Amino acid sequence: MIELGVNIDHVATLRQQRHTAYPDPVQAALRAEDAGADLITLHLREDRRHIQDADVYAIRPLLRTRMNLECAVTPEMLEIACAVKPSDVCLVPEKRTELTTEGGLDVAGAQAAVTDAVQLLAEAGIRVSLFIDPDARQIEAAARAGAPVIELHTGAYAEARDDAAVQAELARVRAAVAEGLRHGLRVNAGHGLHYGNVQAVAALDGIAELNIGHAIVAQSIFDGWDKAVRDMKALMVQARLAAVRGHA
């Protein structure tokens, strides 16, 4: 069944706004697991704008599920990842001026560096994912780099405003899923997904995992953290089951 990775970055964003000790991302991670999260995702950025090094080290030994650590392809971040040894590392692009990750990693344009990073992490026993746009060229480059997993950037789908654009972007994601599977890759997806748009993506056969954070944190203000996580997971599972029944 499709899995939910709960991204806790914006729990840390709220904390860092006042440099307080609360809300605690560790507590958010453990509560998310209790509410049905299949893994916990967190992004240690170079600018440390939300998740801090201490969060990563504190959360890692406490999780009962998987830790998916997002980080840039830099010596510092790769060193931290190898020290922490999460089950998964997702390599992502970073710009200091961006509000959130603006696009996928250009694997094709940095083939050697990404390949070296994938090999380094794999030798440390870490499964590597590459966060890329739903583009055949990038998928092929990810396969050449030796990454066993890709995460498709769903931002363009999430930002599409009219039905024609939504359907076009969804078709693009669907084609990318098929291309990833053709290369023997595990295919995940995420970015910009929320309670109103997640089901169309969750219904796509071949997507193993969705990573979602901002929408869950936002909804938790009104519904509470546990319910926000449970409701997102329920939407995903319902969509996948309906799709399976439709194909039967």
Swiss-Prot record:
The reaction(s) this protein catalyses: 3-amino-2-oxopropyl phosphate + 1-deoxy-D-xylulose 5-phosphate = pyridoxine 5'-phosphate + phosphate + 2 H2O + H(+)
Binding site for 3-amino-2-oxopropyl phosphate: 7, 18, 192, 213-214
Localization per record: Cytoplasm
Pathway(s) the chain acts in: Cofactor biosynthesis; pyridoxine 5'-phosphate biosynthesis; pyridoxine 5'-phosphate from D-erythrose 4-phosphate: step 5/5
Gene Ontology MF terms: pyridoxine 5'-phosphate synthase activity
Top-level EC class as recorded in UniProt: transferase
Superkingdom, taxonomy of origin: Bacteria
Site (Transition state stabilizer): 151
An example Gene Ontology biological process: pyridoxine biosynthetic process
Active site: 43 (proton acceptor), 70 (proton acceptor), 191 (proton donor)
GO annotation, cellular component aspect: cytosol
Binding site for 1-deoxy-D-xylulose 5-phosphate: 9-10, 45, 50, 100
Pfam families per the UniProt record, alphabetical: PdxJ
EC number per UniProt: 2.6.99.2
Similarity annotation: Belongs to the PNP synthase family.
Complex and partners: Homooctamer; tetramer of dimers.
Function noted in UniProt: Catalyzes the complicated ring closure reaction between the two acyclic compounds 1-deoxy-D-xylulose-5-phosphate (DXP) and 3-amino-2-oxopropyl phosphate (1-amino-acetone-3-phosphate or AAP) to form pyridoxine 5'-phosphate (PNP) and inorganic phosphate.
Protein name from the UniProt record: Pyridoxine 5'-phosphate synthase
Source organism (scientific name): Bordetella pertussis (strain Tohama I / ATCC BAA-589 / NCTC 13251)
